[in-house]
Amino acid sequence: MSRGIIIIGSGFAARQLVKNIRKQDAHVPLTLIAADSMDEYNKPDLSHVISQSQRADDLTRQLAGEFAEQFNLRLFPHTWVADIDADAHVVKSQDKQWQYDKLVLATGATAFVPPITGRELMLTLNSQQEYRACETQLRDAQRVLIIGGGLIGSELAMDFCRAGKTVTLMDNAASLLASLMPPEVSSRLQHHLTDMGVHLLLKSQLQKLEKTEAGIRATLVSQHSIEVDAVIAATGLRPETALARRAGVAVNRGVCVDSYLQTSHPDIYAIGDCAEINGQVLPFLQPIQLSAMYLAKNLLGGNAPLKLPAMLVKVKTPELPLHLAGETQRRDLSWHITAESDGMIAKGMSGEGQLRAFVVSEDRMKEAFALLKTLSV
């Protein structure tokens, strides 16, 4: 490959791919282009920065220059890719262009901000850069409203509460983690957050935000209002597909790829939070790690389809941690729950008596790997 491989993006997926490529080929030309600084940080740490009194710069693990030297790369930080000419195999920015043999989109996902009046007052915590922009406001805020009771919203609510802040957690659903598991399973976390002092506003929808002398007034559709100092949107992520669309690559929820991580264009691939693999968006660390292993082989001439085993998803709520696996979101499962003082085991069984999903908490998490082996996939 005389022109080599170009990767657009610098997050976890891009870095894992670089490391796997270099394990197999030390010399193939590798170029990374990204809009950020390209410094490495651990994104899951963003769920704990407030209670641990960390500044944005504290999260940096490796500077971009060190990464480039370690893995023999060309890096172009703070560079916005404007267009891709897929037929000519050319990536274009405003003032540069690069030719490639293989191109990988690792453009990640952006935080969704509800389209309400005053949406510009909402903060997001989806990157080190976003945290850097609002860290002073979040440290100084005493009253915090978090919109969204999913994984990230629940993690942030616990973290801000542990930091001594007054926290309100709002969601349209009737329970936390509603897209992941039924209420009888998530209720243990829900009760624990309430006991910690988190105020839950479930079955509630935000209508507007207004700046006031005292802070921010959040008004619900019910016309109930609360005064807070900061509002965080944790309402999910949207895969970044705009660049793929401009390149003429097929997109749906994410950039559509097959089991080889290949898009509708034979020399363009996608990985990580932006990718939709055979109809599934999997924005979790383990599938990204496995995707990087397989994609590295395929970029270097292999023909290895990605095979994903049953995998654990970890909810990083330190005072009541959870692991889950399988089809926990299915509504037709029969849940068998054993809850004791040291933790919970919840098993989702099919009508045929097969274990299709499970959730474990606290000290019972040590049983997760044994359950994983018996999971029907």
Swiss-Prot record:
Swiss-Prot/TrEMBL cofactor(s): FAD
InterPro entries: FAD-bd_OxRdtase, FAD/NAD-bd_sf, FAD/NAD-binding_dom, NO_rdtase_NorW, Rbx-bd
EC primary class: oxidoreductase
GO molecular-function terms, A-Z: oxidoreductase activity, acting on iron-sulfur proteins as donors, NAD or NADP as acceptor
EC number(s) per entry: 1.18.1.-
Pathway: Nitrogen metabolism; nitric oxide reduction
GO CC terms of this entry: cytoplasm
Catalytic activity: 2 reduced [nitric oxide reductase rubredoxin domain] + NAD(+) + H(+) = 2 oxidized [nitric oxide reductase rubredoxin domain] + NADH
Cellular compartment(s): Cytoplasm
Keywords for this protein: Cytoplasm, FAD, Flavoprotein, NAD, Oxidoreductase
Pfam families, per database record: Pyr_redox_2, Rbx_binding
Family to which the UniProt record says this protein belongs: Belongs to the FAD-dependent oxidoreductase family.
Functional note: One of at least two accessory proteins for anaerobic nitric oxide (NO) reductase. Reduces the rubredoxin moiety of NO reductase.
NCBIfam families attached to this UniProt entry: PRK04965.1 (NF003437)
Designated name of the protein: Nitric oxide reductase FlRd-NAD(+) reductase
Organism listed in the record: Salmonella paratyphi B (strain ATCC BAA-1250 / SPB7)
Gene that produces this protein: norW
